[in-house]
């Protein structure tokens, strides 16, 4: 029996680097011989920018142009080929201040299923808006096998990660969703990450170093893999993403997280910075 596609949902604090991370993971998965579809779930519709080099038309744009007649839409109307053979879709969103972005995600999945698009891929990756875990933007968790949380070594990102973990736990009550783990992005240290996972056990899949090229790649509209074609010094950075891909393709067991209460977590992370030993280390 053919193994079905693995579905991933990538979350994290706004501005933490989810889309950059997602695009590089998608290319890494493609480098491992997998057919990959990345679905951007953000009204900014810029998730796939580093794969395609431009802002592709969204599902909502296409539906509006076709008068919301699903039968008039074909896969080539909404799926764009990006770098490394990764296929790209942008859900888009309602006008600012109106409608529900989560509804748009649901309509996107519905349309892609009608087009039998999901049947064509080995991996489907949802790159989701910020750290919003309302019912709407938690919608990709309804379709995912694994959630990945992108963080750094800072208080705010880990606080957001804990809230996302709570959302995963809630969704896991009714479906086989698991947290694959944390991905540390652009951080020179991981001591606060380690402090958090000692209190809230969960895997740390990989921690990417504080390298400016990771941030710059977003502005250039290129993945690290594409940049490495002309700058071989970036190949070791690409290896981090290949490590993540290998971990995910092994289909890890994952966990149902047990997040900390907000006040408990606030005290834990605040205490980390307030301890005398920590203060001496910072002098």
From Swiss-Prot:
InterPro entries documented for this protein: NifH/chlL_CS, NifH/frxC, P-loop_NTPase, Protochlorophyllide_ATP-bd
Family matches, as Gene3D superfamilies: P-loop containing nucleotide triphosphate hydrolases
List of residues binding [4Fe-4S] cluster: 100, 134
Pathway: Porphyrin-containing compound metabolism; chlorophyll biosynthesis (light-independent)
PROSITE patterns cross-referenced by the UniProt entry: NIFH_FRXC_1, NIFH_FRXC_2, NIFH_FRXC_3
Database matches in SUPFAM superfamilies: P-loop containing nucleoside triphosphate hydrolases
Keywords: 4Fe-4S, ATP-binding, Chlorophyll biosynthesis, Iron, Iron-sulfur, Magnesium, Metal-binding, Nucleotide-binding, Oxidoreductase, Photosynthesis
UniProt binding sites for Mg(2+): 19
EC number(s) per entry: 1.3.7.7
Family indicated by similarity: Belongs to the NifH/BchL/ChlL family.
Function: Component of the dark-operative protochlorophyllide reductase (DPOR) that uses Mg-ATP and reduced ferredoxin to reduce ring D of protochlorophyllide (Pchlide) to form chlorophyllide a (Chlide). This reaction is light-independent. The L component serves as a unique electron donor to the NB-component of the complex, and binds Mg-ATP.
Protein's UniProt name: Light-independent protochlorophyllide reductase iron-sulfur ATP-binding protein
The organism of origin for this protein: Synechococcus sp. (strain JA-2-3B'a(2-13)) (Cyanobacteria bacterium Yellowstone B-Prime)
The encoding gene: chlL
């Amino acid at each position: 029996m053919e193994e079905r596609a693995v579905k991933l949902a990538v979350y994290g604090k706004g501005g933490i680097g989810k889309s950059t991370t997602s695009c590089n993971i998608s290319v890494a998965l493609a480098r491992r011989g997998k057919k990959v579809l990345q679905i951007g779930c953000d009204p900014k519709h810029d998730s796939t920018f580093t794969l395609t080099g431009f802002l592709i038309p969204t599902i909502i744009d296409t539906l509006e142009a076709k008068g919301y007649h699903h039968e008039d839409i074909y896969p080539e109307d909404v799926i764009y080929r990006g770098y490394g053979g990764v296929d790209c879709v942008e859900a888009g969103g309602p006008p600012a201040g109106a409608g529900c972005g989560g509804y748009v995600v649901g309509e996107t999945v519905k349309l892609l299923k009608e087009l039998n698009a999901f049947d064509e891929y080995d991996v489907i990756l949802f790159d989701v808006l910020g750290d919003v875990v309302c019912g709407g933007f938690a919608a990709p968790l309804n379709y995912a096998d694994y959630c990945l949380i992108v963080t750094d070594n800072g208080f705010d990102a880990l606080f957001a990660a804990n809230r996302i973990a709570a959302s995963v736990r809630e969704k896991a009550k009714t479906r086989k969703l698991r947290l694959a783990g944390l991905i540390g992005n652009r951080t020179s240290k991981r001591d606060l990450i380690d402090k958090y996972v000692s209190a809230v056990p969960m895997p740390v899949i990989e921690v990417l170093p504080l390298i400016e090229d990771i941030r710059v790649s977003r502005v250039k509209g290129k993945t690290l893999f594409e940049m490495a074609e002309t700058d071989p010094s970036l190949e070791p950075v690409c290896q981090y993403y290949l490590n993540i891909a290998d971990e995910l393709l092994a289909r890890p067991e994952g966990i149902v997280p047990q997040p900390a209460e907000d006040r408990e977590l606030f005290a834990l992370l605040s205490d980390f910075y307030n301890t005398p030993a920590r203060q001496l280390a910072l002098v």
